[in-house]
């Protein structure tokens, strides 16, 4: 007959129990009195092991007067004396006992979940196995049950330190070997409130077994790892493992303690007495028992040795009650000792043949490899088997009977050689002189399925990525399609078919936004992905393919060059520099070329008939000649003169090229257009002589240069050029005696204009000689914006490096009145302008890297052309190799105003002004 547990807390038993048989009283007394440590060595096999979950021991299970007795309404008499401190520790001199039973751990148990009542099956052995039955079972209580009276619950099933007699101690327990275990009530009671509540009347053995198998199908303990008698003394199974679910889903007695399992230090060992919710708590009698602090302790140690042992283990792995270490221990029990490695009932879909093989496999492992470490305090110096360091006398070391006698480990070194985790509860497997946990030892013998985590007992399996699967389990993780012989992709250790992988993990192309399939090439950079095609993996600006080429990632885009990364095509300067580096020069079209506007005379050819006349340097014949590019609007390739005649043979026909229509640049620098000159930067400098008054500006071409350009030494024909379209408007009112101005290209291409020629169609030789006798003065520009004197509209002159690099025109400023005055002054006073360039001297002069200005900032005067034939600018070399570009205000009307003032001034003052200016040197 069975009696349900009552919710009472700590209870004692009386000899008379309201009609219950006397043998039940004796059973209760026997089972409660088995807690006394001086009886442990008689019944060490049957002691309950340490629990994996906290139990409060704030009160003694036998000293609670508030709790009524279990079977009687009589108040219990007070105990005759208080408890004494923990006395004689258990010894290791016990005969070997073989234990067998249920598995050790419960699959799927969460760390915070109360484990079920733990049922331990103990095989009949030297300690008395329950009257020769197949095995006696006992179940541990659940975690921390709460008593109705609000007092702390007490569960002390293994070792309460006391030697005092009590009302229950009428019959010595060592005279009753027929009662096999502590608290072996065999009833699947739900929530026992105290140690006394665990005691119940006995049941027939067959009823116990039947009820156990029917109502507790999942009970599991470490006893299943320890086979029947036949193993070595230390291979007796640990009595403390995970109990499984009891009836009603209530948690059982947690993960086992250290007492009663392995032979040698099992009997009477402190089996993990449960303390309060804090560490280092003390019981009511201030015994200082170390068992109250831990959920598991090594068997056979004194309290001081227990502290010494755990001090050698990392703090986060010490199984304090209600600590991280306790939860870690529970997890490691399930990890290191999988129940499906030993018990058929925890496996799925096994055939009869596989069931038999699993039983043989489990029994062989237990017989040949299973063992449990023994903790001892050494008295001599030994060397740790794992770390090789010496352990001095007094240190706690772990020994294993399956190894050599003096083989030992530090407590923190007693770990699995594969996973490097501490062997939970010191349970190890031996193979080839190495320590293994249960999981990895089984994997050394048979493969483990990566899907179901069970040992593969079949003859065939699927292996992929260095892992194994049951054939039916190797399937897509998403759609469960079997992948045997199919293509698959592993992701996070799980196989996927191609379709599911594309749907779940495919990247999207940054260019076309389409998914990149597993069969398509993929380019990736910094979290971005592209199809590995010329269309997708290309420069974001020019769309040139970047496959096999270095690329420039910028702002989430990829580019082929720095220019493209700035969002613009190569600049004209870059194009110019690139082309000028080539040995032969070709005519390059300017992005913004000039086009000479129509003159006021109306006798110019329309703009659509303009031609580009280029003088090319013959690299093989003319070594240092300059390149010339002249563009003049002409009809049928000839220049039209206004009134003095036409000369169309001034330009060689061989260097004349027709170009398409171009729009003029918006250039407004008019005032300095005839006097602003640039000197050569690299290969030579040009001497610029500017004469004013009645002198005309002419390009003197001699020697091979004239031959190259088609201009004879005497000037085959006057060619009027101007780099500024605004200059043509200034010269429009000059009358019929002035030649029209042809537009010279202000081109950033490799053929910039070097000479701006304004020629008169009359006598060329006289005008050349007239340069020395002109009474006008030449004004040279400087960077300053002061009151410099201008007497001419100025034209731009570009000096070109031998490398062909472009010089940008500098802009100067002058302040003027209006366009009409400028036109009138030009008509009255200036018919001709000449731009003099001495090419022979430039070949003999070093490179000038600076800007040549034509305005003196010191005296603001011009030199007289009557004194000098050519006013030559001295060279100046700077420390750097680049061109200095100065930008100035470009109001050209100021030039006309200042020129008018000079005309009205006295001739003497003008001559003095011109003479003062001739000695000014621009540097």
Swiss-Prot record:
It is found in: Cell membrane. PROSITE patterns: LIM_DOMAIN_1, LIM_DOMAIN_2, PET. Residues 817-827 have a biased composition (Acidic residues). SMART domains: LIM. One of its GO terms (molecular function) is zinc ion binding. SUPFAM superfamilies: Glucocorticoid receptor-like (DNA-binding domain). Residues 11-34, 59-73, 106-118, 152-169, 184-196, 853-865 have a biased composition (Low complexity). InterPro entries: LIM1_prickle, LIM2_prickle, LIM3_prickle, PET_domain, PET_prickle, Pk/Esn/Tes, Znf_LIM. Residues 777-786, 840-852 have a biased composition (Basic and acidic residues). The keyword Cell membrane applies. It holds the Pfam family PET. It is a peripheral membrane protein. Keywords: Cell membrane, Developmental protein, LIM domain, Membrane, Metal-binding, Repeat, Zinc. Residues 382-446, 447-507, 508-570 form the LIM zinc-binding domain. The keyword Hydrolase does not apply. Residues 1-196, 571-668, 703-867 are annotated as: Disordered. Residues 275-383 form the PET domain. One of its GO terms (cellular component) is plasma membrane. Belongs to the prickle / espinas / testin family. PANTHER family: LIM DOMAIN-CONTAINING PROTEIN, PROTEIN ESPINAS-RELATED. Acts in a planar cell polarity (PCP) complex; polarization along the apical/basal axis of epithelial cells. PCP signaling in the wing disk requires the receptor fz and the cytoplasmic proteins dsh and pk. These act in a feedback loop leading to activation of the jnk cascade and subsequent polarized arrangement of hairs and bristles. Dgo and pk compete with one another for dsh binding, thereby modulating fz dsh activity and ensuring tight control over fz PCP signaling. Vang, stan and pk function together to regulate the establishment of tissue polarity in the adult eye. Interacts with dsh; PET and LIM domains interact with dsh DEP domain, in wing cells. Interacts with Vang in photoreceptor cells. This is Protein prickle.
């Amino acid at each position: 007959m069975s009696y349900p547990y009552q919710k009472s807390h700590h209870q004692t038993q009386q000899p008379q129990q309201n009609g219950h048989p006397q043998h039940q009283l004796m059973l209760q007394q026997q089972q409660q009195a088995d807690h006394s440590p001086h009886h442990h060595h008689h019944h060490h096999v049957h002691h309950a092991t340490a629990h994996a979950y906290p139990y409060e021991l704030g009160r003694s299970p036998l000293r609670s007067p508030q709790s009524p007795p279990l079977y009687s309404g009589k108040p219990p008499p007070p105990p005759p004396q208080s408890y004494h401190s923990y006395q004689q520790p258990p010894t290791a001199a016990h005969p070997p006992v073989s234990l067998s039973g249920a598995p050790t751990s419960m699959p799927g148990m969460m760390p915070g979940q109360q484990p079920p009542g733990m049922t331990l099956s103990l095989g009949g052995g030297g300690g008395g196995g329950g009257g020769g039955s197949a095995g006696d079972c006992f179940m541990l209580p659940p975690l921390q049950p709460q008593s109705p009276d609000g007092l702390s619950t007490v569960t002390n099933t293994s070792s309460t330190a006391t030697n005092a007699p009590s009302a229950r101690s009428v019959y010595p327990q060592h005279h009753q070997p027929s009662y096999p275990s502590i608290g072996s009530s065999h009833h699947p009671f739900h929530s026992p409130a105290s140690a006394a509540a665990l005691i119940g009347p006995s049941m027939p053995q067959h009823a116990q077994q039947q009820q156990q198998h029917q109502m507790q199908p999942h009970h599991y303990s470490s006893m299943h790892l320890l086979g029947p008698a036949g193993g070595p003394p230390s291979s007796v199974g640990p009595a403390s493992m995970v109990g499984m679910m009891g009836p009603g889903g209530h948690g059982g007695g947690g993960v086992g303690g250290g007492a009663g399992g392995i032979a040698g230090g099992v009997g009477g060992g402190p089996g993990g007495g449960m303390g309060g919710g804090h560490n280092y708590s003390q019981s009511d009698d201030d015994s200082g028992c170390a068992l109250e602090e831990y959920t598991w302790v090594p068997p056979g140690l004194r309290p001081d040795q227990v502290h010494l042992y755990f001090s050698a283990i990392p703090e986060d792995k010490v199984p304090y009650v209600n600590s991280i270490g306790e939860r870690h221990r529970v997890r490691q029990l399930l990890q290191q000792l999988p129940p499906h490695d030993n018990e058929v009932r925890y496996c799925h879909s096994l055939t009869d043949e596989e069931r038999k093989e699993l039983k043989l496999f489990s029994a062989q492992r237990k017989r040949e490899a299973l063992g449990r470490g023994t903790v001892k305090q050494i008295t001599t110096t030994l060397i740790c088997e794992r770390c090789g360091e010496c352990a001095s006398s007094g240190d706690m070391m772990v020994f294993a009977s399956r190894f050599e006698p003096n083989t030992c480990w530090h407590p923190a070194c007693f770990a699995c050689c594969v996973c490097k985790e501490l062997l939970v509860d010191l349970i190890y497997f031996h193979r080839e002189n190495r320590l293994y946990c249960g999981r990895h030892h089984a994997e050394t013998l048979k493969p483990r399925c990566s899907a179901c985590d069970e040992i593969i007992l079949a003859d065939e399996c699927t292996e992929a990525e260095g892992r194994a699967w049951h054939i039916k389990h190797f399937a897509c993780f998403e759609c469960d399609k079997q992948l045997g012989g199919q293509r698959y992709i592993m992701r996070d250790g799980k196989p996927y078919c191609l379709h599911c992988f594309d749907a779940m993990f495919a990247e999207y192309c940054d260019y076309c936004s389409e998914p990149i399939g597993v069969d398509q090439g993929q380019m990736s950079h910094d979290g971005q992905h592209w199809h590995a095609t010329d269309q997708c993996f290309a420069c974001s600006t020019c769309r040139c393919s970047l496959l096999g080429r270095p690329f420039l990632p910028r702002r989430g885009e990829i580019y082929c060059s720095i220019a493209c990364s700035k969002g613009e095509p190569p600049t004209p300067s870059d194009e110019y520099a690139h082309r000028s580096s080539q040995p032969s020069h070709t005519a390059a079209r300017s992005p913004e070329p000039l086009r000479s506007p129509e003159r006021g005379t109306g006798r110019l050819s329309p703009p659509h008939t303009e031609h580009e006349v280029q003088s090319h340097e013959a690299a093989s014949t003319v070594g240092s000649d300059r390149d010339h590019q002249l563009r003049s609007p002409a009809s049928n390739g000839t220049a039209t003169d206004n009134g003095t005649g036409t000369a169309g043979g001034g330009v060689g026909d061989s260097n004349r090229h027709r170009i398409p229509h171009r729009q003029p640049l918006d250039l407004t620098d008019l005032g300095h257009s005839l006097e602003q000159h640039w000197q050569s930067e690299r290969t030579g400098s040009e001497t610029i002589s500017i004469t004013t008054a009645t002198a005309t500006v002419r390009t003197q071409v001699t020697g091979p240069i004239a031959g190259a350009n088609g201009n004879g030494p005497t000037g085959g024909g006057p060619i009027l050029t101007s780099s500024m379209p605004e200059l043509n408007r200034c010269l429009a009112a000059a009358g019929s005696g002035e030649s029209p101005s042809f537009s010279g290209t202000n081109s950033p291409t490799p053929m910039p204009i070097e000479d701006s020629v304004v020629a008169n169609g009359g006598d060329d030789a006289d005008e050349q000689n007239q340069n020395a006798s002109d009474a006008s003065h030449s004004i040279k520009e400087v960077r300053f914006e002061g009151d410099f004197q201008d007497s001419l509209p100025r034209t731009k002159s570009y000096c070109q490096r031998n490398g062909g690099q472009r010089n940008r025109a500098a802009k100067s400023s002058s302040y003027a009145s209006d366009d009409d005055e400028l036109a009138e002054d030009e008509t009255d006073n200036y018919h001709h302008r000449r731009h003099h360039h001495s090419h022979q001297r430039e070949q003999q002069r070093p490179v000038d890297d600076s800007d040549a200005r034509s305005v003196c900032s010191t005296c603001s005067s011009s030199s007289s052309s009557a004194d000098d034939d050519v006013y030559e600018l001295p060279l100046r070399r700077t420390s750097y190799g680049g061109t200095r570009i100065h930008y100035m205000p470009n109001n050209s009307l100021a030039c006309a105003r200042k020129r008018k003032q000079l005309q009205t001034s006295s001739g003497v003052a003008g001559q003095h002004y011109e003479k003062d200016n001739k000695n000014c040197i621009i540097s």
